Amino acid sequence: MEQSSGRVNPEQPNNVLASLVGSIVEKGISENKPPSKPLPPRPSLLSFPVARHRSHGPHLAPVGSSIAQPKDYNDDQEEEEAEERFMNADSIAAFAKPLQRKEKKDMDLGRWKDMVSGDDPASTHVPQQSRKLKIIETRPPYVASADAATTSSNTLLAARASDQREFVSDKAPFIKNLGTKERVPLNASPPLAVSNGLGTRHASSSLESDIDVENHAKLQTMSPDEIAEAQAELLDKMDPALLSILKKRGEAKLKKRKHSVQGVSITDETAKNSRTEGHFVTPKVMAIPKEKSVVQKPGIAQGFVWDAWTERVEAARDLRFSFDGNVVEEDVVSPAETGGKWSGVESAAERDFLRTEGDPGAAGYTIKEAIALARSVIPGQRCLALHLLASVLDKALNKLCQSRIGYAREEKDKSTDWEAIWAYALGPEPELVLALRMALDDNHASVVIACVKVIQCLLSCSLNENFFNILENMGPHGKDIFTASVFRSKPEIDLGFLRGCYWKYSAKPSNIVAFREEILDDGTEDTDTIQKDVFVAGQDVAAGLVRMDILPRIYHLLETEPTAALEDSIISVTIAIARHSPKCTTAILKYPKFVQTIVKRFQLNKRMDVLSSQINSVRLLKVLARYDQSTCMEFVKNGTFNAVTWHLFQFTSSLDSWVKLGKQNCKLSSTLMVEQLRFWKVCIHSGCCVSRFPELFPALCLWLSCPSFEKLREKNLISEFTSVSNEAYLVLEAFAETLPNMYSQNIPRNESGTWDWSYVSPMIDSALSWITLAPQLLKWEKGIESVSVSTTTLLWLYSGVMRTISKVLEKISAEGEEEPLPWLPEFVPKIGLAIIKHKLLSFSVADVSRFGKDSSRCSSFMEYLCFLRERSQDDELALASVNCLHGLTRTIVSIQNLIESARSKMKAPHQVSISTGDESVLANGILAESLAELTSVSCSFRDSVSSEWPIVQSIELHKRGGLAPGVGLGWGASGGGFWSTRVLLAQAGAGLLSLFLNISLSDSQNDQGSVGFMDKVNSALAMCLIAGPRDYLLVERAFEYVLRPHALEHLACCIKSNKKNISFEWECSEGDYHRMSSMLASHFRHRWLQQKGRSIAEEGVSGVRKGTVGLETIHEDGEMSNSSTQDKKSDSSTIEWAHQRMPLPPHWFLSAISAVHSGKTSTGPPESTELLEVAKAGVFFLAGLESSSGFGSLPSPVVSVPLVWKFHALSTVLLVGMDIIEDKNTRNLYNYLQELYGQFLDEARLNHRDTELLRFKSDIHENYSTFLEMVVEQYAAVSYGDVVYGRQVSVYLHQCVEHSVRLSAWTVLSNARVLELLPSLDKCLGEADGYLEPVEENEAVLEAYLKSWTCGALDRAATRGSVAYTLVVHHFSSLVFCNQAKDKVSLRNKIVKTLVRDLSRKRHREGMMLDLLRYKKGSANAMEEEVIAAETEKRMEVLKEGCEGNSTLLLELEKLKSAALCGRR
């Protein structure tokens, strides 16, 4: 049914219906004459798109009513009455009841926590049943007159401004208030609902409402005396205490309601009872205490971090924002200006609409208010709200990127918490995704484009593209990564509770239902609901948008010929969706004619000028082509590739034709050509278009050659030109990857399917032209003064040039790997001479001695690059420098290897007269001559990597990969998290350091025991902690370096030379080192680099039959697949965060001894002998790392691992069996680690006031008691009292262990009756004071001691002198005889009476009681006999006092005293 526009024609008196729609405000020009004075607007805005009530018109009366009857049926009087009713319809509409959505009473962040960790939406949406008070609101009586119609708005405003009066029929305190403060006059009319600003509603028509109305009518008929009498009768029947509680609560609620301001707490009952008649509930929050710290310290449980974060997010609910995205401070707008009555979500639109004077939006808007305003019936208000949301999200992202990585917000920090704002906006309460999806269907173009802008901010389109643009320039792997938010799966007991588990998608791919119609082909009923869509959006906003069918809407917008701005924005959104996950990429590819529409829109512009949407179109196709090889081949086959890359061939003659386009057009054309060349690169990597090199190379010659920079500098086009040139060289690098073997015989050029070496020589000449001009362009001799705006793009260009040259040189190899080269291509020494001549390297010792010390001048290009890396504040400039260093280093290493290989072919040294110094350097070895400078660069990056890995590790603070769901840069983490340029810079530095480690392999064979070698080992360990999902090769190289036999031999030397070791014996042959190296490398590679097999549902199989439950359960922790690391989507150039483990946790090296008892990490159950061998090698490796950690000059990552993890690993390895400590070498190593960690524990205990240093339950796992049961069960079954095994078990009785774990350990040991198997106190780890001090004060632990005493679990322990017996005697003696605290009297008396009563029943424990009576810590035998007698007498008095006069117990004490005096035990 169409609605009227609201315009009334005065010449048509019969057009009465149209005049009744005045409350629907729309744009338009009224046909009436403008009044002399503007009429006030009507505040009848409705929530959009909630259905309007029929009273808002058109007014078609039901059949049978007087309005619907024919004209001749009504007489004049009835017609007049009907007309009068129509005239008063506006006032009637004020009390109409529109359709209501389900109300959310308050924000519950616990629901969010359940949502992000669970998979069933039904479990998160169960309403909490609570007792609700019945509310009756007074309203003015309805008067059916013309005056009432004209004054309806004023009446509604007056009703809103008036205080609401509440009546509760079944609660006496409220009836009392009714008769005193808020008594209703006898002539008052029945209560009606009050307008809420966005809609009105009647009182409920339920039975409770009817009873309410009846009670209220009864009250009207009663006199004041009768009301007072009824009140007194009710008060007499109620409990006074209950009455007092209810009265205080009512007064507190009234006081808070009157004086509430932003941030003031309010009880849940008040929040539920205030404005419950509105469409939205006014958000009220509890007062949030400031957290002390959000940094995850070893002693802070994960639950505390989550609670602190939840409080921060809740605080963001009441923040108000201006239209520029800034937070409106509380003191900017006074309460009198904003008005307390305009503080709720339901009144934001009416506030702005009514307050035409001044600035209606000066008070700002909360996020929920802005979302509510986005559903207004006025398009202008919808646009305004969406622009505000875009500003807030954009501001939040920019602020997050400006903050530090791993930044911990402290209590004193009063700045705006943008992390919490971003998380709240994307959270489940505002339902932003649902509002945006509905706004995208708006019929106003301005609203749609404003909505798309918000989605762009929501998906961080611009920031993510900047990140991927840098990623394109980096090498050498060149892989993209999907942006879907992820979280770590929970640690498992079978894997030793180690962190660093597999990443999982926040929203399961199976829940991203892109096309509902495909699932409904079998005729089943669609059970998907908006609730499920919102649930998925709460886990991942991009997944929620796809599930809400955003792709069909985007396709429809593209088909309707949108504006250039809208087209560019929606394609940008599509790129973000394609980058999200494989499921989203597949959804775009499978959508009918989606790609064809993109290509068609690209081809509509036949002119030479470039549109921004064309750039995004090519970028989208490139992202889709990266997904898999078949997609790329299809694009080439169906002509899509050719249709979008023709611009590359338009500038082939000279540079002038391009420069004449102008600055803006040149910028757009260069950006388009860059994307087209990247599309070429993707196709080449997929094996397509390689044979088309002769066609492409002439078009690239303009950009490959060095141009006239005076013309470019004059037009300010250096950055635009060099960006195209850089990408052109990267395309040549991709072509170089496909070069055939140079020395293979008879390879036909046209039949090989690839380009050949005949094109390499002109390509090298073009590259050398850039090297020749490098000193003039970069001017590195001036140092820091040479840095300009174009320096970054020039360095990216030189990085591409060096990468291309190094790739060509690496492809030159003989047919056999060990065979020498038959001959050397002439361009190899040509490249070397160019590098030497133009001072890309320094060969002077004097220059190297001042390396990096003088910022005003640099002696070489390498020094200049290293200087920029250390001193530059621009991360992209530093990244370009590191990549340029990487390419240069690879080039000189390849030149050195090729020349040496060619020389080895010569039978006798070839005597050639060397004419120049440059040729002399090349003959002596370019790498050897520049080794001093390379060493300086290596040391610089070694220090850098050692300082960067803690920053990368600090990002994983919360349970999920980021602080909020969605594709936001870094998933909402501070500084961008894993997606920041700072992390990219650290990973690039680690990659360069890996190259330097490979260079130094040949030199490290003779530096056994040196500090330099240990620095390299520590830097390799740090590299493992920095590497991301794209850096598998980097981690494998680090494993190879640390685990090679020579490195293991060096670790053995460090163990033997460790001064902390008391006695140690080690026997191992060279073959043993090779065997351990192989086993450890295989284990670590399989444990940390093996990807997880994906289930069928995650592969995106279409046609899944939907049942009654839409969000089905998928078993996340299935068995590993048989595929290797590279088998997972090997043809894809985009990798996933999910299904892999990197970045590795700091304690990754403990996995060899922490997870050996489980077969989950392999394809089948491993053999027990293999497990044992891995465990033995793991114990040796751990001992070596611990011993060598103090030898290097750099801090070792091993030292940073908390001691609790190391003790836990030593306990875990014992689950393999006794074989692990029956082997002589392994037993010595295990004993050595115990002694070492015991010393570390004593040092930490003396240096820290906090006694609980070993928090096994808090730091390892909350169910650690289960693990303890396994350890004790193994100890009781196979140990036979082994001292080494017993020492490890006794660690859990140390006073540095948290009391809950001590209690669990003691209980398990006591129940298993193995307390007597524990060693004596002098044989335990560490000093004895660690077990005895501080004195035990936990009552649960003391009661466990007492229970073990009385049940006989300590009888044998007393005979054998077990540490368990010593602990009990010491703590009982300290509590009973030394602790005189009054709060311990009852516990002391309980222990005394229980011990004496037990003695009366079991006389054989008299010796144990005498030990308790005579015990004195550490010096019992040194005491004189008189002192002993006096002390015994004093202690007997304490025991008698504890018996509290019990004659039976006192008699037993007399017997004990006699035995003590006689010296009898």
Curated annotation (Swiss-Prot):
Superkingdom of origin organism: Eukaryota
Cytoplasm recorded as keyword: yes
GO cellular component, one term: cytoplasm
Pfam families xrefs: RPAP1_C, RPAP1_N
Signal peptide (UniProt feature, chain positions): none
Presence of keyword Cytoplasm: yes
Subcellular location: Cytoplasm; Nucleus
Keywords, ordered alphabetically: Cytoplasm, Differentiation, Nucleus, Transcription, Transcription regulation
Expressed in which tissues: Expressed in root and shoot apices and in leaf and flower primordia. Detected in the endosperm, embryo, meristems and in organ primordia, but not in mature cells. Found exclusively in the vascular bundles in mature leaves.
GO biological process: cell differentiation
Disordered: region residues: 27-85, 186-211, 1113-1135
Disruption phenotype annotation: No visible phenotype when heterozygous. Embryo lethal when homozygous.
Primary localization class, coarse: cytoplasm
Purpose of the protein: Positive regulator of transcriptional elongation that is essential for cells to initiate differentiation. Interacts with RNA polymerase II and the Elongator complex and is required to sustain global levels of transcriptional elongation activity, specifically in differentiating tissues.
PANTHER family according to UniProt: TRANSCRIPTIONAL ELONGATION REGULATOR MINIYO
Self-association state and partner proteins as the record states: Interacts with HAG3, NRPB3 and NRPB10L.
Note: Over-expression of IYO activates premature cell differentiation and confers resistance to the elongation inhibitor 6-azauracil.
Family: Belongs to the RPAP1 family.
Protein name, UniProt field: Transcriptional elongation regulator MINIYO
Upper classification of the organism: Eukaryota, Viridiplantae, Streptophyta, Embryophyta, Tracheophyta
